[in-house]
Amino acid sequence: MPLRRAVFAILFASLGSPLVAAETPLRLERLERCGDLLASERQEWCLRVRGLGSGLPRLLLDGRELPATALRREGDGLRLRLDRRGHASGPLWLEQGGRSSNPVWLTLNGSHVLAAGPDEVAKNMDGLTTYVDLVSLLIEENHDGRREAERLADKYGARVVGAIPPLNLYQLRLPARDLVQRDALVLRIGSETSVDAVVVEESAPEKGEETEAARRPVDKPDSDSDEWAANRFMDAVNYYQRRVRARQAPLETRPVRIGVIERDVDFDAPDFADYLGPCKAPAPRTCLYARDAERPDNHGSTVAGILAARWDQGGNSGFLRGLDRASQGFQVIVERNSDAGITANVAASVNLVEDGVRVLNWSWGIHRVGARDVDGDEVDSLVRSGIAMSGYEELLEEFFLWLRKEHPDVLVVNSAGNGSSYSGTDEYRLPSSFVTEQLLVVGGHQRSERQGLAVDDPAYAVKRSTSNVDMRVDVTAAACTHASTLERDARGEVHCGTSYATPMVAGTVAAMLSLNPRLRPEEIRMLLRRSAMTIGGDYDFEPADAEDLTAPILPSERGYRLDHRDVGRSARLDMQKALDLAVKSRERVR
């Protein structure tokens, strides 16, 4: 017995030693506004940290240490009080015991909304989870939004708890205990002349666009299939490296900031392990800012990995990471604001745009209840009720109107969806159905089983069976990729969906902007379509079954040649040629 006690004493002593503590990873899992979300000058932030030792850690914002007096320990979490004066938005990370956490982007902009807790939701008549007492009001633009929201809150016994001020949107907590009371209040508030729309949130926050239609089995390519070859991924990396650093005529590039609307990334995976702490290197490099995830194969890790994963570690390989040593660096910011569904996605997007993002990756989308796929069956993937869809439509319309007015150089890249349905039917699919020059819609393809074809052969790739289609889709890209893993040099599971085609295009757009930052959204779309390879048959602009993969290639996109073999076919991303046209656009004046 004395010997056993001695062994346990040594074991407990070793667990409490600094050496063991130093081996425990420090991870920042949550960073959200708390307290008064409407306060702009003095802000409160709540942090949840894994691996936090005793005492307070060092907290650094964009490389500057924040005073210890601004930080308070709350169990396993921290509360930060930050004075906006003297600070700017930037990466925030912790240091303790020789360890550095993952950096997370902290925005000082004022768009934040609350997510409902588990006791604040209910099932509606469609069987969908909906918020009981939290709704958002879009106030008419001729009113002072904050003042009018406060007036309406007083009138109906509610409280203003969140806001997206640039869109004149304010979130109210209603005095409603069930959906009958909520719907009655929504009808009354919606009839106010100052209210443009009421946004009712229906949220399934743990799911993104990652799930393909579950009601039919879908074949995935073999794990050793080089899906990205169909978009000339390696050719594009090689071209960028050689052309930018060419001895005869080197190119000057610019840094680009990309926003990815996702929840988190697993920094325990080898793909992302070297992004911990400050993003410093002798030369500019790709930086990644995100909350830490529990699993390496989650949606956010896979989407972000296509842009930023470290090479030769197994799992994924990031396109922008492959441009290091030639580029001036890319900042990839993974941000979701909160788990308040579509409203939070828009709030995060507004903050990121105000923080200088040029490209937004939206690997998400929703279908209305009752939407039909190309076979006439009902879509059961990511559906929302009619009342929610009408509010979302108004919210997204306000976002794109604001984007066109205040930030006309920003481009949103959006997934077409995985419902085997139509992307352009505005009454059934959002946001891909919006027609605006600042929204690029991406469909998905995979390698065909035919052997010996040239990469530019239209039959080299085929449409992913679950990918949404029609003429609103601008271009297709590889829909299948490998997930990240916890094991070094291990091959991850194959994940498929238009979610993963979207960052292929977003990364290409970011690289194009680094080569020519003067490119406008409509010019980027034109260059992507002019450079595109083709996929599918030649339908002479009108497929017999009305299933356009993308908008057909036009003669104007092929030098006005009516007899060009590409005319009438659908567009498949050519990453290398798109970069080449971006370089040539530096000298051309239209």
Language-model features, listed with the residues they occupy:
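Protease zymogen maturation seam
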Residues: H112-L128, L187-R257, A269-D271, R372-V374
